[in-house]
Structures are given as C-alpha cells and as structure tokens.
Amino acid sequence: TFTGRKQDGKLIGKCTQGAMSTDLELSPGIVKLKRPQTPKPPYPYTTKEVRFNNLSDDVTLAGTLALPEGFNETTPAIVMITGSGLQNRDEEIYGHKPFAVIADYLARNGIATLRYDDRGYGESTGDGKNATTEDFARDAKTAMEYLRKEMKFKNVGILGHSEGAAVAFMLGADNNPGLFSNPNFIIA
C-alpha cells in the first residue's frame, strides 16, 4: 500500500508491503525504456509459430518454437514456463522480454525451446483467470508431449520461473511411467 501526500507537484509518502516499508517519491515525467537485450532478426536459428492442444482441458496453446541450426532428435529441447499471473510467451514486463532473450541464447548454443502464451492470454485459449497451478502443469505437460511426439525430441526438459518452477517440480515428481510423462531435466 502507499500512503502519502501531494507536495510541490510530487507524491511523497511510504510504500508498505508486508513487514517492509520504504520512503517513496513519485514525480511526473516520461520514462523511456531501454531494452537492448531483445533479440532482433535475422537469427542464426529458425523460429516457428505453433499451436498444440491440451485435450483434457479443451485448451489450445499458442507458442514459438526456436530450433537451432542442424537440430535433430538428440538436440536438447526446453519447455519454458512463466511465473504467476497471466503472461505471454516472452514473459514480457514493461517492454522487457526475458524469455525471448533466454530462448535466443539457448538456440544460439544448440538448444531448442518452446515458449507459449499462458492459457487465456495472448493467442492461447481457455480460462486463465481461474486456472490453478495443476492446470498450468497440464498445459506444460502438453507442451512436453508436443516436443516429443510432433517434433521427435528425445531429451526434453523444463525451465520454470517462479510459479513455473513449481510446475517443473510437479512434472518431475509425477510418477506416471508413460513415455511422454516426465521431463528429462529441470531448470528452476
């Protein structure tokens, strides 16, 4: 919460969250964001817009596949899972696109990635506002299955940020012996 007063055209006060409190001064102005990290084409890898279906929840997920040059079934592939709150495939915040930056780095270093819009956000369908972590885990499992069945990757892992890390560990702990069930590795 913020409590304060207007003084000399500024808002001056305290911002409090839980046990933390800090002084805060807000002034009007124009902020120009600099995002020099955002990858720009041409890329030394291939990108492909894809859609895949979570049939159990009747959700279509839309994403971007980044395929390194010379990829094949032994190329490592990573499903990228965003943190809490509905987000696009790039996990964009204030014009910064951390998942696009990470996917670019990985593709340049021989690792394929699949990042997708959360259900109910961007180009993905479904009800994201009422979705649970378990719902997002089923979406991520569908993404892993897409990489294994459709793209034929054999070494598929999960990279999860924030709530995405919880999803990654849920998938890793799933004891389903099916061929397409568990990630081969987790980055959290």
Residues covered by each model-derived region:
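Short, surface-exposed "cap/lid" segments of acyl-processing enzymes
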Residues: G70-Y105
